[in-house]
């Protein structure tokens, strides 16, 4: 099997990022559990969303997230064991449920529920 992992240590131009995202089979997203924003503790998946989710939707890719990242999305795969365990996962996901219109409707519902 021809398997390679590509990562960057610094920000890359958008066209290069898009090119690699289009070529990718799966996204590995080893995000940190917690961060801080203006001295406020933020927890990814609860009070803060990872941009990796938007990338997975935009490019129609499966994404491996830390096991403790809460997600109901079928394209988010909880990381268990080693990364190698995920390289052979074949999973069909219908990304049409994440169209701009549907995401906007869900966002509006969430915002109005908070008011």
Where in the sequence are the language-model features?
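Short loop/helix-cap segments at secondary-structure boundaries that form the rim of catalytic
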Residues: 1-2, 69-74, 95
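Nucleotide-activated donor-binding/catalytic signature segment of Leloir-type glycosyltransferases, i.e.
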Residues: 1-26
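Short acidic-hydrophobic, aromatic-tinged amphipathic segments that line or gate anion-handling sites
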Residues: 7-10, 64, 75-85
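Structural motif corresponding to alpha-helix initiation and N-cap regions
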Residues: 11-15, 50, 101
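A short alpha->beta transition loop at the rim of the catalytic pocket in nucleotide-sugar-dependent
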Residues: 25, 60-61
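Nucleotide-sugar-dependent
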Residues: 29-54, 58, 66-74
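C-terminal accessory extensions appended to soluble enzyme cores
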Residues: 59, 69, 78-81, 103
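A charged, aromatic-enriched C-terminal amphipathic alpha-helix characteristic of glycosyltransferases
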Residues: 80-115
